[in-house]
């Protein structure tokens, strides 16, 4: 076994309903879309079931064509993977040599570091309060690769175009994770046209509500996209996943209405949380809300009351932080009552 593997902490996904077999719980931990898929997606899935014994076409040409229409980029600028997580792994595999400098501003998504460590990279974790990233601090590291997240997980805030631009001008490569961007309408994806070293990651798990299907994509230079395609799993995205993803892209009107409902509910939830005096509530551009709790054992006490929320202290935050997925209105109201009872 490689020595580096012994030092890697496994990714911690938090608690799941399966961890509570004797209790009915509401999962507000994983930033999932609480609404059912569109009718077109459900029908596409049912049609695809009969193809489960078959491999999907390995180039995923139909999916890439649909993504090209959605993003406005050429097919040659798109790489696909079994969730954005596979693409993070592929990016590290094609870009990083041993001891290359990687910068991961914190607090942020912990999976970036796992795949960078597997490449034996030299990783720096500068901490920026509230994820207010300082490009000058990053530039001092002279990085080969920088991972940025906007809106950031877990803080929920977006990075400005100016910050992304400055980082792209100082780093050899920049990954901009936009898994939650459809909830903010503040995408920097057009910057790929001006910066060949910028890789924008997207996911079908959040806005499109296909977390169980595992589909992600990257928009980047044709050279980087081709390299990613060389090393990704050849059949990593299942046939049903391909068909449901394409159907989701055809159902944009439905998903925009769902998005608008989630955003309205997010703002209402934020105001309700602010009424609880022992919570410090942060603004959000995503489908979750970060709060700092001034009481011990909040995650455990909420679990006892039937709610799973994410302990965000494992994501580079110091103190008692919890991340709450924006659920349906009735679930959010029950959560507020549970918090008031603590």
UniProtKB/Swiss-Prot annotation:
Please, which domain of life does this record's source organism belong to?
Archaea
GO MF terms listed in the record are: histidinol-phosphate transaminase activity; pyridoxal phosphate binding
Q: Which UniProt keywords apply?
A: Amino-acid biosynthesis, Aminotransferase, Histidine biosynthesis, Pyridoxal phosphate, Transferase
EC number per UniProt: 2.6.1.9
**Catalyzed reactions per annotation:** L-histidinol phosphate + 2-oxoglutarate = 3-(imidazol-4-yl)-2-oxopropyl phosphate + L-glutamate
**Gene Ontology BP annotations:** L-histidine biosynthetic process
Cofactors per UniProt? pyridoxal 5'-phosphate
Instruction: Write out the pathway annotation from the protein's UniProt entry.
Output: Amino-acid biosynthesis; L-histidine biosynthesis; L-histidine from 5-phospho-alpha-D-ribose 1-diphosphate: step 7/9
Residue(s) carrying N6-(pyridoxal phosphate)lysine: 206
Q: Family per UniProt?
A: Belongs to the class-II pyridoxal-phosphate-dependent aminotransferase family. Histidinol-phosphate aminotransferase subfamily.
Which NCBIfam families does the record cross-reference, listed alphabetically? hisC (TIGR01141)
Name of the protein this chain belongs to: Histidinol-phosphate aminotransferase 2
Instruction: Give the species this sequence originates from.
Output: Archaeoglobus fulgidus (strain ATCC 49558 / DSM 4304 / JCM 9628 / NBRC 100126 / VC-16)
Encoding gene per record: hisC2
